[in-house]
Amino acid sequence: KNNFLYTIKKMKIFDCTTYYKEDLMLEVRFNILNKYVDRFVVAESTYSHSGEKKKLNFDINKFSKFKKKIIYIKIENEPKNLIYSIKDKSHFEEEANKRMNSIKRINHQRDNLIQGLKEANDEDYIMYSDNDEIPDLSNIDFNNIKNKIIIFKQKLYYYKFNLFFERISWYGTKACKKKNLRTFSWLRDIKSKKYPIYRIDNILSKTKYSNVKIINDGGWHFSQVKTPEDIELKLLNGEQHAEFKRTGKNLEYIRGLVER
C-alpha cells in the first residue's frame, strides 16, 4: 500500500503550450491549473508563423507566482524543410506554399516543447494545448485512466470570457503518458474520436486510435479573447495570414466584431 501511494505521488503532470504574446491567456491558464500541474512548459519562437523575425515577448517576471513551475523554451531557428519560392510558380502554388510553411513553423514550435520534458518520467502525463485551450482537471484522477490517449471536450467562447458559443464543442487539449508521446505535433493531430477496435485502418494510421478517453466538460477554449489590435496581429502573423490579407478586412472590421 505504501509503495502504491508513493507511485501516485511521484506521477507528475506537465502542461505544455506555445506562446506568441498572449500574457492574459497564460495568466488565466496558470491560475486555473496551478493546483493540479507540476510543471508549465512554454515554447516561444523568434519567428512568427508567417516567417517574420520577431523579438521574444515572454517575461517570466510577469508570472512570479508560478516562476518555480515554469520551464521556458526559446526557439531561435526555422524548420529545415521550408518550401522556398521558385520563379514562374502560379499564385495558387505560392499561397499553398505559404500555408504549408506556416504549418511547418507551428509544428516546429510545438515539437520543441520536448526540450522541457528532460525531468519527466515515462509514467508522467504530458498535456498539450494551444494557449487559449484550458483543460478542467478538477474532477480528473489520472491514476484511474488506463487509456493511451486523453482528449478534452471543451466549451468554446469567442471574443469575451462570457460569450459562450454553444453550437460547437471544441476538442482541444490532448494528453498521454511520456512513454507514449511521439511528438507534440503527433499528439495535436490525433483525431478527436474513439474509433472501433475492429477498424483495420487504425492499425496503420498515426491519427486514429481506439484506446482513447474523451473527457466531457473538459474545460474551455477562449478563442480570440484579445484586444482588436492583438487579434489583427495574430491574423497577420498566423497560419492563415495570406488568406486574411486577401480579404481586405482591417482593424476597424475586427473592432466591430468584438464590440458589437
Regions picked out by a protein language model, each given a short descriptive name:
Residues 122-134:
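Short beta-strand-to-loop acidic/aromatic patch adjacent to the donor-nucleotide binding site
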